[in-house]
């Protein structure tokens, strides 16, 4: 399942797993 994690610069980083 893909999720997006908000980074400090305001962008979203996609992660896979969990």
From Swiss-Prot:
Top EC group: oxidoreductase
Keyword match Lyase: no
Residues in coiled coil: none
GO molecular function: 17-alpha,20-alpha-dihydroxypregn-4-en-3-one dehydrogenase [NAD(P)+] activity
Alphabetic keyword roster: NADP, Oxidoreductase
Catalytic activity: (17R,20S)-17,20-dihydroxypregn-4-en-3-one + NADP(+) = 17alpha-hydroxyprogesterone + NADPH + H(+); (17R,20S)-17,20-dihydroxypregn-4-en-3-one + NAD(+) = 17alpha-hydroxyprogesterone + NADH + H(+)
Record EC number: 1.1.1.149
Function text: Specific for the oxidation of the 20-alpha hydroxy group of 17-alpha-hydroxyprogesterone and 17-alpha-hydroxypregnenolone.
Quaternary context: Homodimer.
Protein name: 20-alpha-hydroxysteroid dehydrogenase
Source organism per UniProt: Tetrahymena pyriformis
Organism lineage: Eukaryota, Sar, Alveolata, Ciliophora, Intramacronucleata
């Amino acid at each position: 399942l893909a999720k997006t994690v908000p980074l400090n610069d305001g962008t979203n980083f996609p992660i896979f797993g969990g």
